[in-house]
Amino acid sequence: MELQPPEASIAVVSIPRQLPGSHSEAGVQGLSAGDDSELGSHCVAQTGLELLASGDPLPSASQNAEMIETGSDCVTQAGLQLLASSDPPALASKNAEVTGTMSQDTEVDMKEVELNELEPEKQPMNAASGAAMSLAGAEKNGLVKIKVAEDEAEAAAAAKFTGLSKEELLKVAGSPGWVRTRWALLLLFWLGWLGMLAGAVVIIVRAPRCRELPAQKWWHTGALYRIGDLQAFQGHGAGNLAGLKGRLDYLSSLKVKGLVLGPIHKNQKDDVAQTDLLQIDPNFGSKEDFDSLLQSAKKKSIRVILDLTPNYRGENSWFSTQVDTVATKVKDALEFWLQAGVDGFQVRDIENLKDASSFLAEWQNITKGFSEDRLLIAGTNSSDLQQILSLLESNKDLLLTSSYLSDSGSTGEHTKSLVTQYLNATGNRWCSWSLSQARLLTSFLPAQLLRLYQLMLFTLPGTPVFSYGDEIGLDAAALPGQPMEAPVMLWDESSFPDIPGAVSANMTVKGQSEDPGSLLSLFRRLSDQRSKERSLLHGDFHAFSAGPGLFSYIRHWDQNERFLVVLNFGDVGLSAGLQASDLPASASLPAKADLLLSTQPGREEGSPLELERLKLEPHEGLLLRFPYAA
């Protein structure tokens, strides 16, 4: 019979002890006859051997248990008979022997019960017939551990591939097939590499060139803010450098880049001897106050430009009879205040200074000799283009403020003519834009055009220059007893405490700061756009026709976002007929542009507007933007 063990099974082979109950009586007789306990045990074992020799079938596990129980009863009965027939001493000795023997036999019998339960699995190694079972020493299967592989996959894994040896690998690598394959792959690699290199070269060659950014100074990046009268700027009962220091946060909110301050030096009206450009008038503060103001302004990225116009309290700003003396004083003052840390200077009314061009050239050399980052501003009341150009010819980096645009009238065509003529005459020179050298916008413009001019000044190529109060539309004519050139700044409704109702909330800084549609809010937005957009910072300028009464132009720089400005100076609504034929290919107009802001309320900002159907309200200005298109 072929042995078929289960997976990972263990075959058990043992020789059990049998205590058949049918032959236990002989053991009892031996005990009752006075034999010792060893004889009784021997009889029980002998009876078991006789049972094995008889050839009877092996009892089952339950029968074995019955036999063991019957045998135990017989042994107990034999013990009782022994007690009845023996003397006490012998009884005690026999009792101890029987008790020990029974304890040992009981322990053995319990183990035999456990072994007999496994009997069906313990068959003879060679059980061809029942006769073989009669042999007392018949061989039975013992405990044999057989380890069987779990499955064929495990057997296959045992014989896994260990790879080629070095000699085998070299032999295969040198075969003709692999040699051809390696050459083919190497050729494909270099062809791919050369293709990518050629593609990169083509992209670089055909890509549009990025324009080099022009060198820019700090005054190129934003507006300048003039405070000619400290007392008027700070209001009644104030007007010193310490008070101005407290207003620097307000100037910072306007996003202005420079503060044009003063004059604040000592000046006796029309007395050159009592005019000291090196000393600060005690009414305004001390040198220490000025130094503190400089440090605080620099922390807020605001540059300080000092006005050194000598006779600012007199009739003639330059003491016409003592020009050389005054020129020497100015020269000394430039060197002194440069050392003190100022960022530039302003001199006004230079049309009253004899040989102004030569003096300006000398002062410019002193300023630039100290640092290229220092600025000189000259102011004139002239609106004549030729006179303005004569002042600019010999002074390359001079920034000039004038009344040139104050004669613009109220038509878009005339304003367009003035701007384009000025830009063409000055060429590549950096310009500045204002309506005067010191006065407010309201001195030249009606209230309905203030927003329009703010938009224009912030978007023309150059530096916009404003006076304090221009951001809120400060109008001296609307205030009782105020001078035209320096009215009191309206911070809140308490600016005129002696005249109740003289100032309304919408006229003040406080009231307009809370109104997103106010002139002040528009000023701040335009100033912010002007300082961060490349096209507005140093972009090209192209004016083009848009229809009667309109002034339109485009600002663009390289591949940056473009800005379109359309201004309606008229008193009626107009339709803009934007003619892109006037523009170069680099400044072509799209069909639509997004509205960035309008000077009039009611338009949805960010909405696309069709340029062919563009309509403007009276005195409305639009700032639109559109992306670069190759």
Curated annotation (Swiss-Prot):
Residues 206-630 are extracellular. The gene is SLC3A2. N-glycosylated; N-glycosylation is crucial for trafficking and stability of SLC3A2 to the plasma membrane. Phosphorylation on Ser-406; Ser-408 or Ser-410 and on Ser-527 or Ser-531 by ecto-protein kinases favors heterotypic cell-cell interactions. This is Amino acid transporter heavy chain SLC3A2. One of its GO terms (cellular component) is cell surface. It is a single-pass type II membrane protein. The keyword Acetylation applies. Residues 15-39 are annotated as: Disordered. Glycans are attached at N365, N381, N424, N506. Signal peptide: none annotated. One of its GO terms (molecular function) is L-alanine transmembrane transporter activity. It is found in: Apical cell membrane; Cell membrane; Cell junction; Lysosome membrane. Acts as a chaperone that facilitates biogenesis and trafficking of functional transporters heterodimers to the plasma membrane. Forms heterodimer with SLC7 family transporters (SLC7A5, SLC7A6, SLC7A7, SLC7A8, SLC7A10 and SLC7A11), a group of amino-acid antiporters. Heterodimers function as amino acids exchangers, the specificity of the substrate depending on the SLC7A subunit. Heterodimers SLC3A2/SLC7A6 or SLC3A2/SLC7A7 mediate the uptake of dibasic amino acids. (Microbial infection) In case of hepatitis C virus/HCV infection, the complex formed by SLC3A2 and SLC7A5/LAT1 plays a role in HCV propagation by facilitating viral entry into host cell and increasing L-leucine uptake-mediated mTORC1 signaling activation, thereby contributing to HCV-mediated pathogenesis. Changing N506Q: Impairs both the stability and the trafficking of SLC3A2 to the plasma membrane. Induction: Expression is induced in resting peripheral blood T-lymphocytes following PHA stimulation. Expression increases at the time of maximal DNA synthesis, in fibroblasts stimulated to divide. Expression and the uptake of leucine is stimulated in mononuclear, cytotrophoblast-like choriocarcinoma cells by combined treatment with PMA and calcium ionophore. Up-regulated in response to hydrogen peroxide. Highly expressed in various cancer types. Belongs to the SLC3A transporter family. The modification Phosphoserine is found at S103, S134, S165, S406, S408, S410, S527, S531. Expressed ubiquitously in all tissues tested with highest levels detected in kidney, placenta and testis and weakest level in thymus. During gestation, expression in the placenta was significantly stronger at full-term than at the mid-trimester stage. Expressed in HUVECS and at low levels in resting peripheral blood T-lymphocytes and quiescent fibroblasts. Also expressed in fetal liver and in the astrocytic process of primary astrocytic gliomas. Expressed in retinal endothelial cells and in the intestinal epithelial cell line C2BBe1. Residues 102-184 are cytoplasmic. There is a cross-link at K147 (Glycyl lysine isopeptide (Lys-Gly) (interchain with G-Cter in ubiquitin)). Changing C431S: No effect on dimerization, leucine uptake or interaction with beta-1 integrins. The modification Phosphothreonine is found at T106. The keyword Cell membrane applies. It comes from Homo sapiens. One of its GO terms (biological process) is L-leucine import across plasma membrane. The chain crosses the membrane at residues 185-205.
